[in-house]
Amino acid sequence: MAGRSLTSKAEPTAGAVDRAEKAGGQDTSSQKIEDLMEMVQKLQKVGSLEPRVEVLINRINEVQQAKKKANKDLGEARTICEALQKELDSLHGEKVHLKEILSKKQETLRILRLHCQEKESEAHRKHTMLQECKERISALNLQIEEEKNKQRQLRLAFEEQLEDLMGQHKDLWDFHMPERLAKEICALDSSKEQLLKEEKLVKATLEDVKHQLCSLCGAEGPSTLDEGLFLRSQEAAATVQLFQEEHRKAEELLAAAAQRHQQLQQKCQQQQQKRQRLKEELEKHGMQVPAQAQSTQEEEAGPGDVASPKPLKGERPGAAHQAGPDVLIGQEDTLHPDLSPRGFQEIKELF
């Protein structure tokens, strides 16, 4: 609409310009009239204008009428020019006002675009933050599920360990019952008495053989012939064979007893270690050790102490228990050096 008003108002300005040109033409005609008047005055002074005066007067009248008309047109043109000038000034003011409005609208548009960009960037940032929050929530949910699974597995493992510990504690309690310990002590005592009897029998046999050998040898020593005959006799062979059998049986019995004793000691040590470990685990898990188990711990100074055989006369207490079967065999060798395995081998070679 502003463009249309500007074009509609530009047309009268063009007409005003044409009228201004006409007014300029009238100014030139008035100047010509003045020139003619001067010329007439000059001719009148000279006195050669009589035949042309009327013509000149007519022309002057015409020129004056034209001048009046031109003045009238000039006044109209001036009024029109003033009106157009006022209209032009108003148009200029409207143009300035419209430019101000346009600049304001452009500034508003720029601000709105900036706000729109800020809103878009804020929306994009919020969208990215929402995506990050969703991803973080999903990761936290996964961690929670993993932690729940770990706790469940730990709880199941703890329950299994607790059941195992309770079973082991029950087994230990059954193993350390007074009735069972009494039976074990009785069995060890009986085996000890049997071993002592067999040891006494072997010692008696060895003493008999030693006395027989001493009686055969004599104080000064027998002759080689009698010694050779005796060594080649059936009695010597039977004696050697009997002695070898008794010695082998004694070694087997001693080895079996020592092995049984060692097994019992190892078993007792294992049970004690297991019991101590179970006790530590129970204390670690915050459970109290039963009072009966604590009383049995004081009673069980060690199955090896209970099951250890009594020392023989003239021996230090616990020496037989610490020495084992090898020392007993060595004692037999030291008691009867002549009847050692080397002596048996020499007797066999002589036969």
UniProtKB/Swiss-Prot annotation:
Residues 52-290 form a coiled coil. Keywords: Cell cycle, Cell division, Chromosome, Coiled coil, Meiosis, Nucleus, Premature ovarian failure. Its main location: nucleus. It is found in: Nucleus; Chromosome. The keyword Cell cycle applies. Residues 1-10 have a biased composition (Polar residues). One of its GO terms (biological process) is cell division. Residues 1-31, 267-351 are annotated as: Disordered. GO terms for cellular component: central element; chromosome; synaptonemal complex. Belongs to the SYCE family. It is linked to Premature ovarian failure 12: An ovarian disorder defined as the cessation of ovarian function under the age of 40 years. It is characterized by oligomenorrhea or amenorrhea, in the presence of elevated levels of serum gonadotropins and low estradiol. Spermatogenic failure, 15: An infertility disorder caused by spermatogenesis defects and characterized by non-obstructive azoospermia due to complete meiotic maturation arrest. SPGF15 inheritance is autosomal recessive. Homodimer. Found in a complex with SYCP1 and SYCE2. Interacts with SYCP1, SYCE2 and SYCE3. Interacts with SIX6OS1. Major component of the transverse central element of synaptonemal complexes (SCS), formed between homologous chromosomes during meiotic prophase. Requires SYCP1 in order to be incorporated into the central element. May have a role in the synaptonemal complex assembly, stabilization and recombination. This is Synaptonemal complex central element protein 1. The gene is SYCE1.
